[in-house]
Amino acid sequence: MTHTSSSNPRLDESRTIIAPTGTALTAKSWLTEAPLRMLMNNLHPDVAEHPHALVVYGGIGRAARNWQCYDKIVEVLTRLEDDETLLVQSGKPVGVFKTHTNAPRVLIANSNIVPHWANWEHFNELDKQGLMMYGQMTAGSWIYIGSQGIVQGTYETFVAMARQHFDGKAAGRWVLTGGLGGMGGAQPLAATMAGFSMLAVECDESRIDYRLRTGYVDRKATTLDEALAIIEESKQSGTPVSVGLLGNAADVYADIVQRGIVPDITTDQTSAHDPLNGYLPQGWSMEQAAEMRLKDEPAVVIAAKKSMAIQVQAMLDLQKSGSATVDYGNNIRQMALEEGVANAFDFPGFVPAYIRPLFCEGIGPFRWAALSGDPEDIYKTDQKVKELIPDNPHLHNWLDMARERIQFQGLPARICWVGLKDRARLGKAFNEMVKNGELKAPIVIGRDHLDSGSVASPNRETEGMMDGSDAVSDWPLLNALLNTASGATWVSLHHGGGVGMGFSQHSGMVIVCDGTDDAAERVGRVLHNDPATGVMRHADAGYDIAINCAKEQNLDLPMLSEPK
């Protein structure tokens, strides 16, 4: 049954989706209840950016293709048996097949297009015809947990930047950025947690207001003078503050250059990966952009990319003036390059500059959510992480700050960057906590697709690989296949997340800890094998940290000792 209230099958203003909580099952087991709740959680009004349109985050990253498909997915998950697998093709449930109890209950493929046709123009045509949807990374794979999902990764990046550029001292320094959407909205909180102040430019006032309500932004400004005065005050006091400035990023960045002001760090997290839907051209209102998207898509794209070129040129100018400038993975450099900014890639991406050593040890954005809906279940797992990893004060500090400063969105959840050495141990411990009743209901464990072995993205995660293998996308395919073989509860394989059509392929997995012995076996396999593929991928590329980690963890990599 469908409830759509307009001629657009993707829009239904009457819908409010909130996942069930507690121990009563809607589906036949926790293995199907879990994907059902996490799908619904992606569309919770406190989680999704535009839930009535099925948009979770990242421009047009959706949880389901349309409301009819959403309803059918829910219906199938409630009747799915524990030896059946649902196949989802770009947000549409297309088949249920008999498999076995250790197979995934759901297999998802989103936004995948044969490479020659893998561009926004062809995707948008398919999208209009109702043949495809954009899954982003965790939108269409049902494991988005709100802005917390990227806070720690952003925090780790800012900490690394403080260490690399400022001798570890962030006090009195500030960051210029753009974008306060589902991903970018994590930046202000991550910056202040790391000791920096931040000026974040956002063209949608409702996003600034939402980040204020949820504690991600401290102050709001409507003029650059007002925002800079707040930043100057924080520099003098040494107390970090974040400011959301209502404005256009291209305008503001160029104005800052014109004034001769140099931020300590410059970056950007606008949705530049999608010039049609994600970036507001200079001089345009939000209403004008929405209208033009319906009337003249090419004109919107042209205007957006011209504005991106102006913003990137300003970032290059700030870099020359001494600002530590970094691309935060939205492909804005590529867009500017296509508009004639020949040296757009003169500033690095954040992964090769600051994150890759972590990836070499399989360390990445491990996350879990409490299906009970009770925050106490998360606090208990926080404590378990501290018990099992007692000698990592940086991690303990993160968990303490997260509890104090991060508001849960939808189901209570936690993000925690750990790697190959720890993920399986933690997962099995969580499963045991469910088994013995310490936790009120099962836990789901997943991750971002932005992880060490699950993505090929030459302008982001795999930029500048030392062996030149940036564009080799066999690795995320192998990761998805191995997670399927290992018994993950649901596995996803996507294209275009983060950086847009034609620029990335990536995979995700989620595993349910339901307290059973079978779950313990599956958790052990999946949470070892998944990060191990990241160590394998980086060892194969020749990174010493990864090679040493592979040897320490006794990974069987047949070509490791052979010359390249």
From Swiss-Prot:
Organism equals Aliivibrio salmonicida (strain LFI1238)
- What's the catalysed reaction? 4-imidazolone-5-propanoate = trans-urocanate + H2O
Residues that hold NAD(+) according to the record: 58-59, 136, 182-184, 202, 207, 248-249, 269-273, 279-280, 328, 498
In terms of PROSITE patterns, this protein maps to:
UROCANASE (PS01233)
| Cited function | Catalyzes the conversion of urocanate to 4-imidazolone-5-propionate.
The record's listing under HAMAP family reads:
HutU
Q: Name one GO molecular function term.
A: urocanate hydratase activity
Q: How is the cofactor bound?
A: Binds 1 NAD(+) per subunit.
Q: Which cofactor does it need?
A: NAD(+)
- Protein's name according to its UniProt entry: Urocanate hydratase
